[in-house]
UniProtKB/Swiss-Prot annotation:
This is Transcription factor E. It comes from the Archaea. Monomer. Interaction with RNA polymerase subunits RpoF and RpoE is necessary for Tfe stimulatory transcription activity. Able to interact with Tbp and RNA polymerase in the absence of DNA promoter. Interacts both with the preinitiation and elongation complexes. It comes from Ignicoccus hospitalis (strain KIN4/I / DSM 18386 / JCM 14125). The keyword Transcription regulation applies. The keyword Transcription regulation applies. InterPro entries: TF_E_archaea (IPR016481), TFE (IPR039997), TFIIE/TFIIEa_HTH (IPR017919), TFIIE_asu (IPR002853), TFIIEa/SarR/Rpc3_HTH_dom (IPR024550), WH-like_DNA-bd_sf (IPR036388), WH_DNA-bd_sf (IPR036390). GO terms for molecular function: DNA binding. It holds the Pfam family TFIIE_alpha. The winged helix domain is involved in binding to DNA in the preinitiation complex. Keywords: DNA-binding, Transcription, Transcription regulation. Transcription factor that plays a role in the activation of archaeal genes transcribed by RNA polymerase. Facilitates transcription initiation by enhancing TATA-box recognition by TATA-box-binding protein (Tbp), and transcription factor B (Tfb) and RNA polymerase recruitment. Not absolutely required for transcription in vitro, but particularly important in cases where Tbp or Tfb function is not optimal. It dynamically alters the nucleic acid-binding properties of RNA polymerases by stabilizing the initiation complex and destabilizing elongation complexes.
Length: 173
C-alpha cells in the first residue's frame, strides 16, 4: 500500500474536523505568515461567520492560532490568524495518541465471540443476545454464534497502524 502524502493526510484531518470550509481556510492560511479575518473573508469570498466558524474549529484542535491588534481609528480589535507550524506536528501527535487510547478502550470491550442474525445481519454481544433470548429483535430469527468478530479484527488492525505511525512520528520530532 502506497504511503499518503503528509499534506494530504493533514488536509484529510482538517476536513474531518472543520469540513470543506475548514480546508479552504486552512489552505489559505498556509500561504501567509498571518492574515486578518477580514482579509481571509475577502480572499476566499466566504461569509465572515463561515470563516470564523472554520477558524474556531481549527483552533480547537491546535492547528491555528490568533492574536489581536487594536485598531487605532475606531478602537475595535482586528484578529490575525496563522498556522502554528512549530506546534502543529506535536498537536497532531497528541490527537493521534488520544484517538489511540479511545480505540484501545473500545478494543478491550469488544468480545471474541458475538452473535448475529443470518436474516438481517445485526450483530450482538453475548449479553445483548442473551437479553433478547437469542432471537433477533428486528425480524424474530434465531441468532447464530460467530467465532471471529470482524469489528475486533478491524480495530486491532487500526490500533496497530496507529501505534506504528505514532512511533515513527515520535522518532522524527
Amino acid at each position: 500500500m502506497a504511503k499518503k502524502d503528509p499534506l494530504e493526510e493533514l488536509l484529510e484531518f482538517v476536513r474531518s474536523v472543520a469540513g470543506e470550509d475548514g480546508v479552504r481556510v486552512f489552505k489559505e492560511l498556509m500561504r501567509y505568515e498571518d492574515i486578518s479575518e477580514e482579509q481571509l473573508t475577502e480572499t476566499l469570498g466566504m461569509k465572515p461567520n463561515d470563516v470564523r466558524r472554520a477558524l474556531y474549529k481549527l483552533e480547537r484542535y491546535g492547528l491555528v492560532r490568533n492574536y489581536k491588534i487594536r485598531n487605532e481609528n475606531d478602537g475595535t480589535y482586528i484578529y490575525y490568524w496563522y498556522v502554528d507550524r512549530e506546534t502543529l506536528n506535536r498537536n497532531l501527535l497528541k490527537i493521534k495518541k488520544s484517538v489511540l487510547e479511545k480505540l484501545k478502550r473500545r478494543l478491550e470491550s469488544e468480545e471474541d465471540q458475538y452473535f448475529y442474525c443470518p436474516a438481517c445481519g445485526l450483530q450482538f454481544s453475548y449479553e445483548e443476545a442473551m437479553g433478547y433470548d437469542f432471537t433477533c429483535p428486528r425480524c424474530g430469527e434465531p441468532l447464530e454464534l460467530a467465532e471471529s468478530n470482524p469489528r475486533k479484527k478491524l480495530l486491532e488492525k487500526i490500533v496497530k497502524r496507529l501505534e506504528e505511525e505514532i512511533k515513527h512520528e515520535e522518532s522524527v520530532l
